[in-house]
Amino acid sequence: MTLEEVRGQDTVPESTARMQGAGKALHELLLSAQRQGCLTAGVYESAKVLNVDPDNVTFCVLAADEEDEGDIALQIHFTLIQAFCCENDIDIVRVGDVQRLAAIVGADDEGGAPGDLHCILISNPNEDTWKDPALEKLSLFCEESRSFNDWVPSITLPE
């Protein structure tokens, strides 16, 4: 038995519980950030915020469905945003369900259709450091993931 096999056996239940906890924390963080008015949605809007005030951004969520995986322009944007977030010490995660994200964040258009939710930034609501328990859980999750060389961990949102 190799070290990877031993490590894989031990961490499967822990990994699943860790992932579920991160998904629940992300759900709570999105709702809290939306209530506080510190949520920016959209690839271009997020890029503007990152360019103008990266020190105020605390967390980044990249979301893409399976059909979005073939969108080369979107993948290039994701790569640039990921690089910018890593360079500026902004925690970042990926979500594979844009519709679930839309159900949490809500619709932006007058027609009720969700706006561009491929990138969501969460900023500090004021000058003081924002102390949100869900944000702290996600920061720890991202830190642990980086220790396993998973720089942009994927999270599954709860139903």
Swiss-Prot record:
Name of the featured protein: Growth arrest and DNA damage-inducible protein GADD45 gamma
Lineage: Eukaryota, Metazoa, Chordata, Craniata, Vertebrata
Function: Involved in the regulation of growth and apoptosis. Mediates activation of stress-responsive MTK1/MEKK4 MAPKKK.
Gene name of this polypeptide: Gadd45g
GO cellular component: cytoplasm; nucleus
Domain free text: Two central helices mediate homodimerization through parallel packing.
GO-annotated molecular function: identical protein binding
Residue ranges, annotated region (Homodimerization): 43-86
Stretches assigned to coiled coil: none
Disulfide bonds: none
InterPro entries the UniProt entry points to: GADD45 (IPR024824), Ribosomal_eL30-like_sf (IPR029064), Ribosomal_eL8/eL30/eS12/Gad45 (IPR004038)
GO biological process, one term: positive regulation of p38MAPK cascade
Family that this chain belongs to: Belongs to the GADD45 family.
Subunit structure: Undergoes concentration-dependent homodimerization, which is required for growth inhibititory activity and enhances interaction with PCNA. Interacts with GADD45GIP1. Interacts with PCNA.
Key words of the record: Apoptosis, Developmental protein, Differentiation
SUPFAM superfamilies noted in UniProt: L30e-like (SSF55315)
